[in-house]
A protein has these predicted regions:
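Short, compositionally biased pre-sequence/patch detector
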Residues: 1-226
């Protein structure tokens, strides 16, 4: 629909500020959402409903799992994946999300986990020498866990504890409604679940287009979405 096309164009401009508005931008935006050509409508100033919703939204008790996405960006996962193509091919971010979901008690049939989909490859035990990630994770014992998974998990725990004064489980375990499609993933939270500590670390801010998950991700707060 026009709103999805506009969001895709905005995501492309955010990712590539040098890309000029024009026919080329619209072509790339249409390719992103695979929509037929039509006029782009300007965004509404009212609160818009989640994009591409199912007729009935599913409910999850672990809606905060996707709050991990902005934090992974903060930890530099985009550059990390570019420097470690084997881990990118094995869908490291999906491994991280499902590992955290399991540790926080989300069952395999949780609607959000099903919407994300499972990684298709096992994660290789690639040695990690990324100084930024090693510093963020602090000293840890790797044991039998793939190093990249263990390091990002430790770095996330440390960042959430220091910045929001909560544990990773407290971040993740929060009820939400889930709308999903092949290109979009929207979560709706009750307004009274807004947490200043979580906002302070930017975990509940819209991720927008997330290339390593292949989705446009948006968070909605308010009882009309929950």
């Amino acid at each position: 629909d026009p709103r999805s096309l506009w969001l895709a164009a905005a995501a492309l401009l955010s990712a590539r500020p040098t890309l000029a508005p024009g026919p080329q931008l619209l072509t790339r935006a249409r390719a992103l959402v695979q929509l037929p050509a039509h006029t782009v409508a300007p965004p509404s100033h009212t609160v818009a409903p989640p994009s591409h919703p199912r007729p009935l939204a599913d409910r999850t008790a672990h809606g905060g799992l996707l709050f991990v996405v902005p934090l992974l960006r903060h930890l530099g996962i985009d550059a990390f994946l570019a420097a470690h193509p084997a881990l990118a091919d094995a869908e490291l971010p999906l491994h991280i999300l499902h590992d955290i979901a399991t540790r926080c008690g989300a069952p395999p049939d949780d609607p959000l986990r099903l919407a994300l989909g499972a990684p298709s490859l096992d994660l290789p035990h690639t040695p990690i020498h990324d100084e930024r990630l090693l510093a963020a994770a602090g000293p840890i014992r790797l044991r039998d866990t793939p190093p990249a998974l263990a390091l990002f998990r430790a770095a996330l725990r440390r960042h959430v504890r220091r910045g929001a004064r909560i544990g990773l489980r407290t971040l993740v375990v929060r009820p939400a409604r889930v709308w999903s499609s092949r290109t979009h993933l929207d979560l709706g939270f009750a307004m009274d679940l807004v947490d200043l500590g979580i906002r302070r670390i930017g975990a509940d801010l819209h991720p927008g287009h997330v290339p390593w998950l292949g989705r446009m991700i948006h968070f909605h707060h308010g009882h009309q979405h929950f």
